[in-house]
Structures are given as C-alpha cells and as structure tokens.
C-alpha cells in the first residue's frame, strides 16, 4: 500500500499495487468503508472505495512516510468481514467475538483502554485469539466470571491465565474446552459459585 500523504488529513488516496492480501485477493470492496487500515506506524479510516486497488481515507494517525509497504492490517470488523455477534468485559478488557469471517476468534482490547485494539506483547496490550478445535465453533455468548466462559456451537470453553490466578496477558492465555454440548445464542446464567 502507498498513501498519497503521510500527514493527518481527509480525502487521501491509498493505493495498492495489486489485490493480493486484500479481502482474500478480491481487493477493496464497497463494504470496506469505515474499516481501519494500519501500516507505517499510522492509521486511516476508509471513507470511500474508488476501485479494487484504491480507497479514499481519512488519516487519523500520521504515517511515518509515504513509502510503499506490503506490511499492513485491515480492521477486523466491517460489512465485508462481519461485525461481532457478542461482547463482554473481562479483567478490564473489552472483548468482542464471533464475526462472520472469524466466528471462533476473540478480540481483547488493551487493559483499561477499551477503544485500543492494537496488539502487542506487553502485559496490557490488546490480543487476538482463535479457539483451536477440530471443527468450526462459532461463538454464541461470553460470560465473565472467574474465567471468561465462551459458549460455541460445538462446546463450551474457558479463557484464563495459564495455570495461575494472574490476569490474562498476550503471553499467558489458555483456552480450554469444558464440554461438548454446544450453545445457543441465549446468554449464560451463572448458577451457584
């Protein structure tokens, strides 16, 4: 991707040299409007689509330069990829889950900074985890108790810190299957302790 400008501005074209790596090789779609693009230490919000290789954006965080790069990220939530089907708070993090493209993926915000979804390796950084399973387990609900209980179409899972009583961080998340009953879209109700 190459931005026409590196500064915070509106109406800036961002051009891709090819559709490779954009929406599974389909390039930019009209449903990408509103989606965030991040690269070169900056961020831009897509405001319109010109064609499969050009989008018009509002740069919200300045890019370090206007050099072309193949290292970029498109925001996970959009009309193209789907929006989260459930949301919860867990250990001072806002957690989204269950998009159309990533039905068994959990998106955790930065601890105490609910709008910051920038992943990293620091203990308080945002993180993204996908439930590993032999089948697609679309997430139906999440319930925060001592652990984050995640109900999916194929079973129930818990998300917690790796064998400790510590808070979850990008380096210690454990996701364990608890049962194989499967869940509906009805929210869980805690019973007992």
For the regions a language model picked out, list residue spans one by one:
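Autoprocessing Asn-cyclization modules and mimics
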Residues: 1-71
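Beta-propeller and closely related beta-pinwheel folds
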Residues: 73-93, 98-193
């Amino acid at each position: 991707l190459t931005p026409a400008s590196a500064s915070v501005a509106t109406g800036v074209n961002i051009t891709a040299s090819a559709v490779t790596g954009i929406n599974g090789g389909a390039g930019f779609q009209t449903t990408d409007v509103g989606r965030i693009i991040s690269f070169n230490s900056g961020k831009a919000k897509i405001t319109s689509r010109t064609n499969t290789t050009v989008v018009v954006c509002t740069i919200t965080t300045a890019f370090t330069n206007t050099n072309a790069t193949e290292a970029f990220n498109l925001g996970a939530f959009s009309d193209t990829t789907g929006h989260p089907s459930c949301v919860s708070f867990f250990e001072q993090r806002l957690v989204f889950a269950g998009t159309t493209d990533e039905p068994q993926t959990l998106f955790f915000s930065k601890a105490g900074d609910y709008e910051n979804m920038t992943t990293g390796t620091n203990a308080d950084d945002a993180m993204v985890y996908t439930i590993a399973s032999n089948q697609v387990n679309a997430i139906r609900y999440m319930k925060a108790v001592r652990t984050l209980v995640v109900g999916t179409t194929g079973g129930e899972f818990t998300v917690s810190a790796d064998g400790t009583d510590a808070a979850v961080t990008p380096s210690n998340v454990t996701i364990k299957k608890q049962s194989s009953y499967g869940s509906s879209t009805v929210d869980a109700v805690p019973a007992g302790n």
